[in-house]
Design a protein with these regions (language model features):
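Alpha-helical transmembrane segments of multi-pass membrane proteins
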Residues: 1-419
Length: 419
């Protein structure tokens, strides 16, 4: 019996191939996580803009998700020509080609994703529905990334299934991180423009890493590639103020928008967007939400309804209000004769930020009879089942808006009636 021993050269080649495969797979996990983070973060930003332009119409989320998933499916299918057989041990040239394809898809997806919201603003002045096409395009380009990433980093051996599961796990972790960080942290700290610019820079950083790995042994190509990515990143930062200029004016007034239109205040946080025009009218999530006014003389917000509380109850000592908005109703009710305490439940603290700016209502925040609680109305009622009030006021929004049944359902009315 004879045995063939491998030569030192063959052992070295196998060792190098194994090390390259390990690095390739580690890079694959990182790219899967990063692409998930960017994709889900962009989707959250897009939904904010689409919800605002539609006044929170309940069909918008479904349409946005449908176009997003359609794009992902088409992008995944379209990546097939780039997923050619690479053999058990792909060469460095094979890796470079795969990385260049990945860099191209991520670059284009990032650029389109960045301009979706500004483009929606421009579309809104005529017809904003075509903007869904940009959502599908960006999602399609990003949807091609995961198949390409898997093809690049997973060797076709008996562990391919296990490795693919970890790639999916990395993508899910990145997506979840994007949902949490963007939805709960960044939206409480930054504006839509700042978040969009940040995501664009993250995307360009991902492209830069891919470009570096694809051309690291070609100094001239590497220099040109990185210079192009850097110029694109700088261009996005420089263009952002112009692209996002008067975004919410366009989304709010749509076909009635004109260049002189101006919102005097815009508050953005993780709960939504509140805008105020120069007539002191408030728009929450794009829909009319009252005005800063307590006068019956110039009753632009029909505050006679708040004064009518005195006619509906002979002596309302304890009053509960679900919703604060401009604070005009709360200001009137808290100063009615006989009212001893007013408890106000408001889910969006941004309204208090605006109330401080208007003389007609700002004293509400320092009124000792008034307690403002930042919470969900249903949750507060459930947690305070023993509380009782003489009068409950709810000046709710349009019944057809998304989530309006949280306040208008029979179940909620029964819950409120118990207090």
């Amino acid at each position: 019996m004879t045995a063939t021993a491998s030569s030192p050269l063959e052992s070295t080649d196998a060792s190098r191939a194994g090390a390259r495969a390990s690095v390739r797979y580690t890079l694959t996990l990182g790219m899967a996580a990063a692409s998930g983070f960017i994709a889900l973060s962009y989707e959250i930003v897009w939904y904010r803009a689409f919800a605002f332009v539609s006044w929170g119409h309940p069909t918008v989320f479904g349409l946005l998700l449908a176009f997003y998933l359609l794009g992902v499916a088409l992008g995944a299918a379209g990546s097939r020509p780039f997923c050619k057989p690479r053999g058990d041990a792909p060469s460095e040239a094979d890796d470079a080609r795969a990385l260049r394809a990945l860099a191209g898809f991520v670059f284009l997806a990032n650029v389109v994703g960045f301009v979706v919201v500004p483009a929606l603003g421009r579309f809104a002045t005529t017809n904003w529905l075509p903007a869904f096409g940009l959502v599908a395009l960006s999602a399609g380009l990003m949807g091609a990334v995961l198949p390409l990433v898997a093809h690049f980093g997973i060797a076709p051996d008996d562990r391919a299934g296990a490795r693919l599961s970890y790639v999916y796990l990395a993508n899910i972790i990145g997506s979840s991180s994007g949902s949490f960080l963007t939805g709960f942290v960044l939206m409480d700290a930054w504006s839509t423009r700042e978040i969009g610019t940040f995501l664009a820079l993250v995307g360009f950083a991902m492209v830069a890493v891919l470009a570096f790995l694809a051309a690291r042994k070609k100094p001239l190509v590497l220099g040109l590639s990185l210079a192009f990515v850097a110029a694109s990143a700088a261009g996005s930062v420089a263009a952002a103020p112009k692209l996002f200029d008067k975004l919410y004016e366009r989304l709010l007034w749509k076909t009635k928008y004109h260049e002189d239109a101006k919102l005097v205040h815009v508050v953005e946080n993780r709960h939504g967007v509140i805008a105020v025009n120069d007539y002191n009218q408030v728009y929450g999530g794009g829909a009319y939400d009252g005005a800063f006014n307590v006068s019956l003389v110039d009753d632009k917000n029909v505050v006679e309804r708040a004064f009518a509380v005195a006619a509906m109850h002979p002596s309302p000592k304890r009053v509960l209000m679900i919703g604060l908005s401009s604070g005009s109703w709360a200001q009137i009710i808290s100063n009615l004769p006989g009212v001893e305490s007013v408890t106000i439940i408001e889910i969006n603290p941004g309204y208090m930020e605006l109330i401080r700016k208007y003389d007609a209502v700002k004293s509400l925040l320092s009124n000792p009879k008034v307690q403002i609680v930042v919470d969900d109305g249903r949750r507060w009622l459930l947690r305070h089942g023993s509380e009782r009030f003489d009068f409950i006021s709810m000046n709710t929004s349009y019944n057809w808006r998304a989530h309006s049944t949280n306040l208008l359902s029979r179940e909620f009315m029964d819950l409120a009636r118990g207090h």
